Each structure stands twice: as structure tokens, then as C-alpha cells.
């Protein structure tokens, strides 16, 4: 298991008022209770963000646990906490993340997508699923920053998800933290198989992604299913990997990744988390 952290939130003075973008692997729902090394690293980073960016006014987060036809954004003013899973310890169902929603920010998201030629709608009833609230419990544990969740469109490819994030880049200069919640590896069959030793393919796939992200090799990343080692074993389905492209799109050209975690949990779940700054 390897875990390293770089907690710099900004390395470029020109971006002093531009919030970073966060990609976070949310792992199992148990990440809310079993934080490992990744949870504290996210909490420390979140504290630094709040100190350095007092203008923080909201979060826009994509989760693969909200998949819909088309493009949607949550406009629920009080989304609440949805325990959208089964078979876990009772303590997990007692957790709440009571962050308010932000309908006005949802409208800003819709406007930016419209300007980019992306048709989208709002959902005023949507609650926060665990792909959103579990990582946010670590990043912003006070639950006092309004949250707007973005759906992952069914059948979207990497380029389309990238475009969704790219259209929202300007929000970073307007006090908005953009978060993409997914998983660097997500093979549930192996996860439920109870492996404890870190599988070699998990490390090889994760480090390949890191190399491409750091080099800005977007075309190679778009072609990940053919280019990455062990791609289909790391992701038998692609929904937990695609939020990465939302982060990369929102990060934009020249963004550098500052890794917060390279931890592997349960032998198969790479908990990679990094902030993009430019």
C-alpha cells in the first residue's frame, strides 16, 4: 500500500482567486466510517482550501451514482442524505450530511452549459447520494457549504463528460469548488471476493493514469480502454472512471495534479485523490 500527499492548494500566483478542482475516489460506502489515510488527507486539504479561498460559496460535484438520460443538475434547496446502498452496518445509515442545496448555482451551471451548446435540465427533488456525501464528509465535514450535484449521463463517453466539466471552468473564479467523485479502480467482483493484498493491476493502472494526467496526454486518456494496462479489469464498467474527465475538463489546459492520496483499500480499490490547479 502506498500513500503520499501533497497538500499545496495553489502553486501559481496567477490563479490565486481560482479554486482548484478535486478528483476523489469514494471507494466503498464504508469510507464514511473507515477513513484510512485518504480521509484525513482530504480533511486537511479541505481546511487549507477554506483558509486560502474565503470566497468559497458552493460545491458542484459529479457522482456516478446518479445516472440519467441527458444532462441534469440538482436544484433541490434541501437535498438531504440518501443512503442508497444495502447490507452495511447500522452506523452507516445513521450518518447525515445536511449541507444545503444551491438552486441559484444550479441555474448558473445550466446557463454555462447552454452557452456551450449543451442541453440540460434541473431536478428539484434529487437528494445527495453516497458518491457525493461520503467524500464531502471528509473534505468539508461541517456540511455548511451549499452543494449542487451533477448527474453522469447514461452512455456518455469520456469526451462528452470532459466537455461538461470544461464548460464550468469559469465557476472556479467565482467561489465554486468543482469535485468529481468516482473511483480510480472499481472491480466489485474482486472487492466482494475479500482480497486483502494489493493487486498488482490496481497499482499499474493507477500509476498509468497518473502519468497521463501529469503529462497532459488527453488523447491517450480518452482512449483509456485500449491504451491503459488492465483497463477492463480495473473497470469492468466505466461509470466510476468517467468522472475523472469531468475534473480534467474543469481543470483545463495546463492544470497540474497535486496528489493527496495513492492509498489502496481492501486490496482492489485505488483511493487516488488529487487536486488540479492552474
PLM region spans:
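Surface-exposed, charge/polar-rich loops and edge strands
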Residues: 108-111, 115, 145-146, 156, ...
Amino acid at each position: 500500500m502506498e500513500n503520499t500527499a501533497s497538500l499545496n492548494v495553489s502553486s501559481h500566483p496567477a490563479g490565486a482567486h481560482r479554486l482548484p478542482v478535486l478528483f476523489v475516489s469514494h471507494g466503498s460506502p464504508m469510507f464514511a466510517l473507515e477513513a484510512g489515510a485518504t480521509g484525513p488527507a482530504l480533511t486537511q486539504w479541505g481546511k487549507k482550501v477554506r483558509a486560502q479561498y474565503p470566497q468559497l460559496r458552493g460545491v458542484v460535484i459529479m457522482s456516478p451514482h446518479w445516472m440519467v438520460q441527458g444532462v441534469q443538475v440538482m436544484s433541490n434547496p434541501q437535498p438531504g442524505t440518501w443512503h442508497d446502498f444495502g447490507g452495511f452496518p447500522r452506523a452507516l445509515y445513521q450518518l447525515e450530511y445536511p449541507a444545503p442545496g444551491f438552486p441559484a448555482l444550479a441555474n448558473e451551471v445550466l446557463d454555462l452549459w447552454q452557452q456551450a451548446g449543451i442541453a440540460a435540465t434541473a431536478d428539484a427533488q434529487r437528494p445527495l447520494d453516497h458518491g457525493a456525501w461520503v467524500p464531502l464528509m471528509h473534505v468539508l465535514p461541517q456540511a455548511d457549504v451549499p452543494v449542487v450535484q451533477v448527474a453522469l449521463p447514461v452512455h456518455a463517453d469520456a469526451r462528452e463528460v470532459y466537455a461538461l466539466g470544461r464548460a464550468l471552468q469559469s465557476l472556479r473564479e467565482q467561489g465554486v469548488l468543482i469535485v468529481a467523485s468516482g473511483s480510480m479502480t472499481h472491480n466489485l467482483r474482486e472487492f466482494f471476493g475479500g482480497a486483502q493484498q494489493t493487486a498488482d493491476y490496481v497499482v499499474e493502472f493507477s500509476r498509468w493514469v497518473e502519468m497521463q494526467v501529469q503529462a497532459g496526454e488527453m488523447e491517450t486518456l480518452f482512449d483509456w480502454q485500449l491504451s491503459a494496462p488492465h483497463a477492463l479489469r480495473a473497470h469492468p464498467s466505466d461509470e466510476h472512471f468517467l468522472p475523472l474527465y469531468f475534473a480534467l475538463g474543469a481543470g483545463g489546459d495546463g492544470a497540474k495534479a497535486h496528489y493527496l492520496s495513492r492509498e489502496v483499500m481492501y486490496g482492489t480499490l485505488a483511493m487516488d485523490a488529487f487536486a488540479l490547479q492552474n
